[in-house]
């Protein structure tokens, strides 16, 4: 596979076009932070208002990932991804044209939906690659696409500066002239144009394969009554974390106490609506009118553990990326620019670490053990990072050697975090194929749940070394607990290293093919 990766034919064309779709969705989703200073100065916003806009940037991502997962399973990744990328232009242009704080907030809320794009490519990639190669393929998709956030951070200021000759440029205090409006609008327009190209360039499945759809996309289909109640329990944090976001909006003064109460009632209603839809999907099972054969069953605890792994890896990544520049600046007395450059090393690891985690999962012969070992190493890495201030004090200060040592520790920990993400989504497509989109949506949503929970905790901790130490210790202990669950409760998925996906041979036989589809893929499609 590695030697064929450079080709742009067959399934590799699909992989490259899909990771780039994810890349663009993250460029759009993360286009606020690099230009926040210019936006703040242009509108005369205070720090609380900027934080409110930042909260709105993630507010709807959690429910959007769940809903996108449902749409994905019903309509297929080709149409779903194309429409999401085309949609991205609307809130981007609206944000760029905003004339007051309220319009900025509304546009950013609408734009937070774009952050759900990751889920779509998980199923698209799984449709084109056999189980034995799914880890590396999903890792490349996730790792290279995720780099869109770093690309946005490094390039948008330059783009805004280049576009400064257009009307609407605004001089940043003690900085260059930036046309942030054109820069943000451009990201959305480029995404929309690529969405059109994507629709006419890809297919949902290879030739001869039928796209498997769930019996209903209104909620996750489970195969035992006990799993239904487990599903209800695991849906609670998805609404609960939105309540935390509503509370944070009240704390910064955007919500009044009355508006906060209304939001809580609405979110309780959202949970009940979701529960009702899950009941509709599974009512025959609950009433005893339907039973699943042993071959058609799956254990929902598999999904639950993957949701927890994504909390401790992707959730912690988003949280750490947000606080790491301030951590380096405060711990070692560095300038903001240098601290930001050092912190960027954490995100850069995505290019190799996430595919690396998927490749390890493919090659070691046990996806379960790979997940457990990577999560264990991640937990140890965070605990070591919590001791950086103590090591600094023991060595007598924050000289160049200590900064380099801290950077090495950070990048090492980052590798295990992002490799763990790759390992997580090496398992997700193997749980139950016809509901892969919904499983990916829920697991992905839990990553955002973790990020909001960790950042909320961080905002409540004391400033300085004590708060940083508690924060990293919390990340480390949470990872160690989840590693235990991976070792002793997570089960190896059926057909983890098979030549074809669940039910594939029957589908192929029905269409008159005499050889397995992966062989057709490698020999004929390419």
Where in this protein do the model-derived segments appear?
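Extracytoplasmic gate region of multi-pass secondary transporters
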Residues: 32-36, 231-266, 299-344
């Amino acid at each position: 596979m590695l030697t064929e990766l450079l080709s742009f034919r067959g399934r590799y064309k699909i992989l490259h076009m899909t990771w780039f779709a994810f890349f663009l969705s993250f460029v759009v989703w993360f286009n606020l932070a690099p230009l926040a200073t210019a936006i703040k100065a242009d509108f005369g916003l205070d720090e609380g208002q900027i934080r409110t806009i930042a909260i709105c940037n993630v507010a709807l991502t959690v429910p959007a990932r769940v809903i996108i997962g449902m749409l994905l399973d019903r309509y297929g990744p080709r149409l779903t991804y194309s429409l999401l990328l085309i949609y991205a232009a609307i809130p981007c242009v609206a944000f760029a044209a905003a004339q007051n704080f309220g319009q900025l907030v509304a546009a950013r809320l609408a734009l937070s939906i774009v952050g759900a794009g990751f889920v779509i490519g998980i199923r698209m990639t799984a449709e084109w690659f056999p189980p034995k190669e799914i880890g590396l393929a999903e890792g490349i998709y996730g790792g290279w696409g995720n780099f869109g956030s770093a690309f946005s951070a490094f390039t948008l200021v330059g783009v805004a500066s280049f576009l400064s000759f257009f009307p609407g440029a605004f001089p940043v205090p003690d900085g260059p002239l930036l046309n942030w409006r054109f820069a943000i609008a451009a990201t959305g327009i480029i995404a929309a144009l690529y969405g059109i190209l994507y629709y006419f360039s890809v297919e949902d499945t290879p030739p001869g394969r039928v796209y498997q759809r769930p019996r209903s996309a209104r909620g996750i289909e489970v195969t035992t009554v006990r799993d239904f109640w487990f599903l209800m329990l695991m849906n609670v944090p998805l609404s609960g974390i939105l309540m935390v976001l509503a509370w944070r909006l009240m704390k910064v003064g955007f919500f009044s106490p009355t508006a906060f109460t209304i939001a809580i009632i609405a979110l309780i209603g959202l949970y009940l609506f979701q529960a009702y839809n899950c009941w509709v999907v599974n009512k025959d099972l609950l009433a005893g009118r339907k039973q699943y054969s042993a071959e058609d069953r799956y254990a929902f605890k598999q999904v639950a553990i993957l949701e927890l792994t994504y909390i401790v890896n992707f959730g912690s990544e988003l949280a750490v990326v947000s606080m790491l520049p301030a951590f380096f600046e405060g711990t070692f007395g560095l300038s903001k620019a240098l601290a930001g450059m050092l912190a960027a090393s954490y995100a850069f690891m995505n290019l190799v670490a996430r595919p690396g985690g998927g490749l390890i999962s493919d090659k070691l012969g046990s996806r379960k053990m790979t997940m457990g070992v990577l999560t264990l190493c991640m937990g140890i890495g965070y605990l070591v990072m919590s001791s950086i201030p103590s090591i600094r004090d023991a060595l007598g200060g924050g000289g160049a050697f200590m900064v380099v040592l801290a950077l090495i520790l950070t990048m090492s920990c980052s590798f295990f975090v992002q490799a763990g993400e790759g390992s997580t989504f090496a398992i997700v497509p193997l749980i139950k194929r016809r509901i892969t989109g919904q499983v990916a949506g829920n697991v992905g949503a839990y990553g955002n749940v973790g990020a909001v929970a960790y950042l909320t905790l961080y905002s409540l901790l004391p400033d300085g070394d004590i708060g940083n130490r508690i924060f990293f210790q919390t990340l480390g202990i949470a990872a160690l607990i989840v590693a235990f669950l991976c070792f002793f409760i997570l089960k190896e998925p059926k057909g983890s290293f098979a030549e074809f996906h669940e039910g594939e041979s029957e589908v192929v036989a029905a269409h008159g093919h005499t050889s397995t589809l992966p062989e057709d893929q490698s020999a004929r499609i390419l």
